[in-house]
């Protein structure tokens, strides 16, 4: 559906109750950025946002091997995508760029979301070249940007060249094929979208600094020409931020430990020790006894919680030692 939702509504669909403050929302075009749902199919994401370097409406329905595999909306370029493409050994221009972007302020130190990559380059063109996409997270205070659209456990960008199965093109070996899911031309009646192939659902994640402004830019482009589109599907409600009180700790008797949410006083706080309410409505709490501590944080519809265990460092009395000196006296 590329007509019903405004850019703000699309972002709301991604965030749901993820407790972030959002601003400066922008999309390239509602022809290339839109809402989707799996419509009763077996597609692995129930609903969310699709961003395609072409017409998103060409993606719906079963796989059809015709002109809908390729389309062009614009001739825009993108410097960040071009750099990724160049670093992969490609030399032609990235064009037909589509994006969704917005600024946000997290309330925790972690940020993540789920996504799936699909492309019509799978099969015939998976050995030679690939379209490029990125999830560019920028710290607006430092200007430092990071691409979160990488193969899990690596720093390799997600592309058809880097996630492929040689079953569908024997001219090149498989690469990270455990992340490849489905090649639709081999089973058209069971296909869930009109694209040749797609990956499994992956998770993009990053450490962030609470109360610091960031920009996230979800962007995709065509390599070299407008032929054989690619798309990224982002799961609705998967943009999450979580509260982290830190790891479980062990403390000596008589010592204190400060648990800190790193949030400001505009939130409401309720602390618990072993399930019982303790403390005041404060962002931090001083622990002076072992136990299981948790906090519930609310602000409007935002709700966050975390739990940490504080153990007592048990010190046992040492065993008595005896020695016998059998040497000659001096």
Regions found by a protein language model. Give the residues of each.
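Aromatic (Trp/Tyr/Phe) and Gly/Pro-enriched flexible surface segments
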Residues: 1-244
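Proline- and Ser/Thr-rich low-complexity, intrinsically disordered segments
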Residues: 238-330
């Amino acid at each position: 559906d590329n007509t019903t939702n405004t850019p703000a509504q699309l972002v709301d669909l991604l965030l749901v109750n993820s407790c972030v403050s959002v601003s400066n929302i922008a999309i390239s075009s509602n022809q290339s950025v839109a809402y989707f749902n799996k419509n009763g199919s077996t597609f692995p994401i129930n609903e969310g946002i699709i961003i395609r370097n072409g017409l998103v409406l060409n993606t719906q329905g079963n796989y059809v091997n015709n002109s809908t595999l390729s389309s062009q909306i614009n001739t825009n370029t993108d410097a960040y995508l071009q750099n990724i493409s160049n670093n992969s050994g490609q030399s032609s221009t990235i064009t037909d760029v589509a994006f969704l972007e917005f600024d946000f302020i997290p309330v925790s130190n972690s940020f993540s979301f789920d996504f799936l990559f699909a492309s019509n380059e799978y099969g015939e063109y998976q050995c030679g070249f690939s379209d490029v996409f990125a999830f560019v997270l920028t710290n607006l205070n430092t200007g430092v940007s990071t691409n979160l659209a990488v193969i899990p456990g690596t720093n390799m960008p997600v592309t058809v060249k880097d996630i492929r199965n040689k079953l569908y093109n024997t001219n090149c070996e498989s690469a990270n094929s455990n992340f490849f899911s489905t090649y639709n031309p081999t089973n058209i009646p069971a296909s869930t979208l009109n694209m040749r192939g797609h990956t499994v659902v992956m998770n993009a994640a990053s450490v962030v600094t609470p109360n610091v402004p960031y920009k996230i830019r979800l962007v995709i482009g065509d390599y070299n020409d407008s032929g054989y589109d690619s798309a990224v599907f982002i799961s609705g409600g998967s943009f999450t931020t979580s509260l982290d009180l830190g790891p479980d700790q062990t403390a000596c008797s008589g010592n204190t430990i400060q648990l800190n949410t790193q949030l400001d006083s505009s939130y409401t706080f309720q602390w618990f020790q072993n399930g019982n309410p303790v403390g005041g409505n404060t962002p931090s709490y001083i622990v002076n006894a072992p136990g299981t501590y948790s906090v519930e944080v609310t602000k409007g519809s935002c709700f966050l919680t975390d739990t940490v265990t504080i153990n007592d460092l048990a010190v046992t009395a040492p065993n008595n030692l005896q020695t016998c000196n059998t040497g000659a006296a001096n």
